[in-house]
Every structure is written in C-alpha cells, then in structure tokens.
UniProtKB/Swiss-Prot annotation:
Entry's EC annotation: 1.-.-.-
PROSITE patterns with a match to the protein in the record: CYTOCHROME_P450
GO CC annotations, alphabetized: membrane
Name of this chain's protein: Cytochrome P450 monooxygenase ple1
Native organism: Rhodocybe pseudopiperita
Superkingdom in the source lineage: Eukaryota
Gene3D superfamilies: Cytochrome P450
Pathway participation: Secondary metabolite biosynthesis; terpenoid biosynthesis
Glycosylation sites: 141
Length: 523
C-alpha cells in the first residue's frame, strides 16, 4: 500500500523540527550569555564615537579597570571588537581555543587596495597561511642554528664599527643591522654599511605599512563599499595611500628576489632561504604557482623582521641611556664571563642579568602594543560571555605588560623582577617573551631569530661601549624624551645620546671589526 501524503511529509517535518530546535537552543544560549562589558552602544554605529584615535591600548586598559573585567567588547557599525587585557584571558582563548581564534580579519585597505595581501602573517587561517608558515619554519628552524648564527655574528661586528664611526646615528645603524641580517638570511644579499638602498626601501615601506595596518586608520575598512568611489572624489585619500603602498609592495616583493635569482644563476651566491627554496622547486609539480608563493614568503620575512626587531633593539639603547645603573650591572656580568672577548651565542645562558634586561625591554615598551588582531570563526562562550562569530579580537599587550599582578610597579625599568635573590632566573614571574610575540597558532614564527639577534647585539655593545646621556653646551646631561612613533608597531623616535668605547682595549677590538667582508659562497 502506497504511503499517504501525511506519511511522506513526516520525515521532512522532522528535519525542519530538528533545525528549528537547534536554532531555538542557540538563541537561548545567546540570551543566557551576554556580551563582555564595554561602553554603551549607539544604534547602528555602535561605539564608533568612543573608539580612541591613538594610543588605544591605554584607553582599553582603563576601560577594563572601570568595568572590572580583563575582557571588554565594543562594536563599530555592526562589527564586534573584543579586547583581552590579561595574559590569562589571551592564553585561554587564543591558545587553548585556537581552533576558533586563529584567523585574521579582512581589511579592505590591506588585502584589496594596498598590494600587501601577500603577507601571510595577516592572511586568514587556512592552507595559504599554513604553507607560508611551513616554508619559513623549514629554513629558519631554531634547532638548526648553524645556518644563520654566523651571519648574525658578522653583521653585529659591523654594527659595532658603525657605532664607533658614527655614534650619533644609533637608530640608523640598528635598522641597518636588522635589515642587513634579514636580507642576507633571506636572499643571500650583502648590503652597504651606510645608506643601503634595500634597507632604505624597507624603512619607507614599514612606515607606510604600519599606518594601513593600524585598526580604524581608514574609513574604507569600516565601510568597504567606499573602495568603489573614484580617487578624484574629495575624502578618498585612502586611494592615494594605497597607490603609494602598491609601489612599495612591488619593489619589496620583486626587486631583491630578482637580484637573488641572478646571483644564483651565476653560481656566485651565499646559501639562503631563497636559494634553498628554489632548489626545492626543481621537483615541483606546480613551479609557477610555487614561485609566486616563494616571493610572498620571502617578502614577508624581509619586511616583518626588519621593523619589529629594530624597534626592540632601539628600546634597548634608550633604556640603557635612561638607566645607567642597569647598564653597569649588565657590563659587570659580561666582563666576568667574556674576559675581553666578543660574546657568542653559546654564552647566552651565562648572562642571567642581561637576559633579564632584555625581558624588561620587551615588557617596558611593547613593540606591538595591541598585538596583531585575531578573528573568531564561530560563536563562543567564555566566562558566561558570548563572543560572536566574526569578532575581531585584540590581545592588549600593553595592558598585559603593565599588569600589576604580574609586574609590581610596572612603570619602573627593573630587570631584577625576573631574578631570584641569588641572581638566577625566577620562573615564578611571567616571561614577557610569552606576551611580546603573540599567542596561539599565530605566534610570531621568527621570535627566536629576533631574540637571538637582539641578545647578541646587546651583549656585544655593552661589552665594548658605554651608552651615556648627551650633554648640552653647559655640560649638563640631557634627559631623553622617551617618545615613540605610535602605530601598530611602536618604535622609539630619535633621542640624543653619547656612545664611546669603555676603554683602550675595547677600542682596539672595535677598530678591528670590518665594515665590509668577503662573502661566503655556495662553493
């Protein structure tokens, strides 16, 4: 007997009933769990009028105290923005729930207009990002130091000579050191000690890029439809900015890669990330696609490390000038270990006080005060708070670094906070390294490389130089202003100081350091 119409309809009705029940349960959960606290929202625009235009990390930290919560939420034209003001909250969500919190928000300015969409560190979570990360990790693996440590030693020695010859250009030399080391490791290219075109290109690019990557810097990121407005219409300055950035992106991605390819073809090259990757491409089934991917990853390495590492090293110099008693203690430790020779990577564990100084550098002035934004790919509930799917999530590294529960008197520069009374590392104190380089699956892939360069440079400089406050025409010391260029990446502005060899023996070591050197080759 054929089933009746009612019998045929029953399975369909059951499916729809199940779907309806699922939606009802989901809606009840959302009603039960409210959003994290934050300023009162206006209809449609939300908190657009409340969002700080600059130094937003301090505002968000203050709001957290006002609402007695280490997680707060605001909205901008329908977009949920969640700020995590404690390391515990960041680890709970970005690390332990990384399956939900590992994507990146889409930026119309960055991903569509500026030409910088190739930067895999800012890509959404997915295969393209994983491929970029794998390529980087394969070459810059911290367990294979023999590849890159000799280059760090080479360029740090040149850095010492640069400081000796032109002591008034500290931050220029810092950028040259980091940029040169990165270029050598990535492309096998050598740079000039002064006014190198590749280093200058990175400097121009990162200044412009840091602006477009700053949250809320351009209205087109809040109202994406504005991208269709012609460039000649008043109020569309983002088009001019994007055009400038496209030029930078092209040269950063293409120019050093082209030179590296030409060197490799002649056989006169130093092994590098690019040379190793090009050799791997010989067996590729999709060589053209993989070649473009390689350019993307190399360009990312070239620009990313050059700015963040230089910022931290610049802060180290500023701190040593501002806090001479810290400098002297570090020098005493170095003298007891080195006995007049230059430091090497194997010496790092013998420098507990210097290691504490570098930890305090990371904490005192975070390089990325708001971190790099994450984005949720699903609804979540945390401490009875509903965090909507698609929320942009910031780890407020500045708030974490100034958390009095972890770091009493956070305004003080005090390396001793990381040491026990007998001068050994105090593992009970949260290591700022675990904050400074991000969280979860999106943690900075180059963190160990950056830390190695910073530590070697800091140890080498303090073993040979005194970093002193500048003096005016009356011989009175000039206190550095401690001002920073504030954007997504915070970097110290130029500050007056004096740099001089500690003694005659130190000067002899410095004078022997080369400004140029014979390039090792693949042969």
């Amino acid at each position: 007997m054929a089933p009746s119409n009612t019998e045929r309809a029953l399975p369909v009705l059951a499916i729809w009933a199940a779907i309806g029940l699922a939606y009802w349960i989901d809606s009840q959960k959302k009603k039960k769990h409210h959003l994290p606290p934050g300023p009162k929202k206006l209809p449609i625009i939300g908190n657009v009028m409340d969002l700080p235009a600059k130094i937003e990390w301090e505002t968000y930290a203050r709001w957290g105290k006002e609402y007695n919560s280490d997680i707060i939420q605001v909205s901008a034209v329908g977009t949920s923005i969640v700020i995590l003001n404690s390391a515990n909250a960041a680890n709970d969500l970005l690390l332990k729930r990384s399956a939900i919190y590992s994507s990146r928000p889409h930026s119309t300015m960055h991903h569509e207009l500026s030409g910088w969409g190739f930067t895999w560190a800012l890509m959404p979570y997915g295969e393209s990002w994983r491929a970029g990360r794998r390529s980087f990790t394969k070459h810059f693996n911290s367990s294979n130091p023999g590849i890159n440590q000799p280059r760090e030693l080479r360029y740090v020695k040149r850095f010492l000579k640069q400081l000796y010859e032109k002591p008034n250009d500290v931050l220029d030399h810092v950028r040259n050191l980091v940029g040169s080391t990165t270029l050598s490791m990535t492309y096998g290219l050598e740079t000039e000690p002064y006014n190198d075109p590749y280093v200058e290109l990175v400097e121009k690019a990162v200044l412009a890029a840091s602006e477009i990557m700053t949250s809320g810097a351009f209205l087109v990121d809040i109202i994406p439809a504005m991208k269709h407005i012609p460039p000649w219409v008043p109020g569309t300055i983002f088009h001019q900015k994007a055009a400038l950035m496209r030029g930078h992106a092209y040269y950063v991605r293409e120019q050093p890669f082209k030179v590296a390819q030409e060197m490799i073809k002649t056989g006169d090259y130093e092994p590098s990330f690019v040379s190793d990757a090009l050799r791997d491409l010989e067996n590729s089934e999709t060589p053209e696609e993989d070649l473009e991917h390689l350019k993307d990853v190399a360009g990312q390495v070239y620009i990313a490390g050059a700015d963040t590492t230089a910022s931290a090293l610049g802060t180290f110099f500023l701190a040593m000038v501002c806090f001479p008693e810290v400098q002297k203690k570090a020098q005493q430790e170095l003298d007891s270990v080195l006995n007049g020779r230059l430091p090497e990577h194997a010496d790092f564990p013998s420098f507990p006080y210097l290691n504490a100084v570098i930890k305090e550098v990371y904490r005192w002035r975070p390089v990325t005060p708001m971190g790099v934004p994450h984005q949720t790919i699903a609804d979540d509930v945390y401490r009875d708070y509903h965090i909507p799917k698609g929320s942009i999530v910031f780890a407020n590294q500045w708030a974490m670094s100034n958390d009095e529960n972890d770091y009493p008197q956070p305004g003080e520069f005090r390396p001793e906070r990381y040491l026990t009374e007998d001068g050994k590392p105090n593992k009970a104190v949260r290591d700022p390294f675990d904050i400074a380089f991000g969280f979860g699956r999106r943690i900075c892939a180059g963190r160990y490389l950056a830390h190695s360069t910073i530590t070697l440079a800091a140890a080498s400089v303090l073993s040979l130089f005194d970093l002193l406050k500048a003096v005016d025409e009356n011989g009175k010391e000039i206190e550095p202003t401690r001002e920073y260029h504030q954007a997504m990446i915070s970097r110290p502005l130029e500050f007056p100081c004096r740099i001089k060899p500690r003694n005659k023996e130190a000067e002899e070591v410095i004078r022997a350091c080369p400004l140029t050197f014979t390039k090792p080759t693949s042969a």
